[in-house]
Amino acid sequence: MKNKEADTELESRLLEILVHPCRIEDIRRELPNAGKNNLKNALDALVADGRVMKNKKNRFAVSAHYGCAAGTYLATERAFAFVAPDYPEGEAKPDDLFIPPNASGGAWHGDRVLVKVSERKNNRGRKEATVIRVLGRAGKELTGELVQRGKAFFVQPTSKKYPEIAVDKHDLGEAAVGDCVAVSISHYGDEQFMPQGVVRADLGESGTMEAAIAAVLHENGVYDVFPNEVLEQALAIPQEVDMGTAGKRLDLRDKLIFTIDGDDAKDFDDAVSLEKLENGHYLLGVHIADVSHYVTPDSPLDAEAFRRGTSVYFPGHVVPMLPFALSNGICSLNPKVDRLAFSALMEVDKDGRRYGAKFAKSVICSKARMTYNKVNKILAGDKGLREEYAFLVETAETMNNLAHALYKRRIERGALELDIPEAEIRVDENGKPVEIRFRERGESEKLIEEFMLQANEAVAEYMCKRELPTVYRVHENPDPDKLRVFASFARPFGYRIDPSKPEDTAQFQTVLRGAKNDPKQRVLPTLLLLSLARARYADECIGHYGLKAKFYLHFTSPIRRYPDLVAHRMLQKALLGEEFTAADETMCEEAADQSTNREQAADNCERDIDKLYIASYMQQFIGEEFDAEVSGVQSFGVFVALENGCEGLIRAELMTGDFYQYDEEHMAMVGRHTGKRFTIGTPMRVKLLAASDTTGQIDFAPADGSLPVSEKLDRPRREDTDRAPRGNRAERRRHSGKGRGGKPGKGKKPPTRKRR
């Protein structure tokens, strides 16, 4: 992981001094004004974090001087592991270190560790290392099956990356043998004793999909039930707007304002409007639910929203950031009722230039609850819908024209439009998956996307130019090493990518345009995505690479994203002219870190639960054959994707007809004798062997003797940057969209699937 900035200026100075070993007396001479206690505390913190070590001669130095490194321990399901070393902000990520069997030092998956690096390398050229100290444990709770052997009880963790845990019979709670349980670790074990734990929750009968889903939620810290004090506060809030307590507001209730969301949406946190101004420009209004009016700082609601960070969506379900009384009730911009909002009113011309923006707390009354499907049909000329919604047809058409202009300007400035298909899982009334299809983005989806982008950028620009604290959404430039890999895959298609110039996004736009028009190149957007950094939240405005935006934050989804709620509070404080304090800056920093972590947990949760639903759906097709495409390559086999987005593994031992070896540099599996290559994008005919709705694992085998359908060019794989400004993948799942459905196509080529 990346190092956080030194907590104090003193720590920064110490890291500079300790490039060479120093005694404490030497350090004091270098820093005479530091103070004895301050110096001791700073040194202790650096040693505890693994950045500084003390040798037997009581000399301090940065860990690298002693051939050591701090990092994150990454266990595997086998005896060996890896460590991802820490690295300074702005530098390229170093290669993972190989931890051979019996060199773990008692570390568990996800722990922060200090390792001694050897000059010896494993058979794949990775440096080996030995764990010499566990700096910090990743977490104290795991899930697994409760089993009994004789009179003893154990929990076998769901993930084989963790060891078995012994549980005393008095620590079983209400759990029965065979249940899936959550267990907290009371002792991590050593050479004499195995790990010990206490059962904290019974998640249901092991071996069921319901228990598997509960385990995924628990492992990611996602809990459906709100604390009583939070529910009490939410239920005490009136479900009708009280203008007497709403404060001074801009009254927009007579304006043509409406929402556009998915068919199944229940919470509406954004509405839009558009008016023609006397100068020929437009007043674009983006009106966001004023959650900050109801969720006040340091309240039980606020503390719980901070802890959750985001709503979590999976097929047929939502685990909300806020109780439904707020998210689906008084905060939701439901039609034909008064609602409090925070409005961004932006002056733009017909070519998409923004001339200014003002922001105000407002009261609105949405005139219609529109859906993407309806608006798309209206824009396509549906006579019935155009008659039913005649009062907004002209506005919708003007909005669409403006959205096209905004999109054009965004692309002209260098924004990357990856447009990677994303699978949508449909469930019936019983929660059973009945369809998997790719979501399509119509005109109205793109319209809302452009309008939300404008609001997010306008608020960020306002705050950043005034150097006021808030939480920004940032996206750093890509790692040149990753771009070099992408360039090597794009070269056979005639593209010349210069990895040393990541700021020149025009070169990537050329690739993306080509991929839209050539099926053979459709894998390239996914490979480019893998080369990009992951977007995150920060208390500094450093811009957004993928959007090519100098100023950017999240303002438009405070019902389901905590950083948006913080952005509202900070903006209102700025508008009122209130003084910002050091506490505000600290709060923004903490909110940014927490929001980034919770977004990652939500993405992990959604991805893993999606796998369970997809596996459940695919069980009906076991034994059947499909056309597929290689979507990833690892030493243990190749991943393949069907045309509906279902992805599974062909294990290396099932690839017959040759002895296949893993070519890590080119992400390929290569036949030693025939030279046959399996790499990203290689089409194959596959047979479905198994699908588990308790692990999400799907297994395929080659249906035609392990030979590719045709020989194709080498290419790489995966990770996240922002796609839609309204939220991450989970937010978009909330909405419906058109796409292909039914059984995975036989004889059809699959589109590339985005993986997070």
Q: What are these regions, as identified by a protein language model?
A:
Residues R29, V177, A182, H187-G189, ...:
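Electropositive polyanion-binding surfaces
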